[in-house]
Regions:
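Glycine/serine-rich phosphate-binding loop and adjoining beta1-alpha1 elements at the start
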Residues: 39-118
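Short aromatic/hydrophobic-glycine micro-motifs
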Residues: 24-27, 82
Length: 127
């Protein structure tokens, strides 16, 4: 079996050591030892599948029983009885995420518009 590949952001000795260690293991051994399953935020599309793909029941079966499931909008029947942390129920997370979304929307508008935003009526709304 091929070794897993990891993409990381940031640089630190700890991160380098962790990536080296993880690259030497199989996915099964990493998954069976994991304390946390981090899902996308929001975690599921309208059909109930994990956004971005993946087989949730198989992933859950391979995890330790007491592993945390972390993501957003985690009201999914497969997660019943699991320890979950739903970022989208945290008002601080939601506010910070809205701030970042608004910042990016304004930046994109500034790049695409043929004029400045100064004096223009502008409303930034989220999801």
């Amino acid at each position: 079996m091929a070794h897993p590949k990891f993409i990381t952001c940031g640089q630190s000795d700890e991160l380098s050591r962790a990536v080296t260690q993880l690259q030497q293991l199989s996915w099964q051994s990493v998954q069976s030892q994991a304390d946390i399953l981090l899902l996308p935020v929001p975690s599921f599309n309208d059909s109930g599948s994990v956004k971005g793909g993946g087989d949730l029941p198989s992933a859950l079966n391979a995890l330790k029983e007491d592993a945390w499931i972390v993501g957003g909008n985690l009201q999914h029947p497969t997660l019943a009885g699991r320890k979950i942390l739903d970022f989208l129920k945290d008002p601080v997370y939601v506010a910070k995420n809205a701030q970042i979304t608004a910042h990016c929307a304004i930046r994109l508008a500034m790049e695409k518009l043929p004029c400045t935003l100064s004096g223009l009526p502008c409303l930034v709304i989220g999801w």
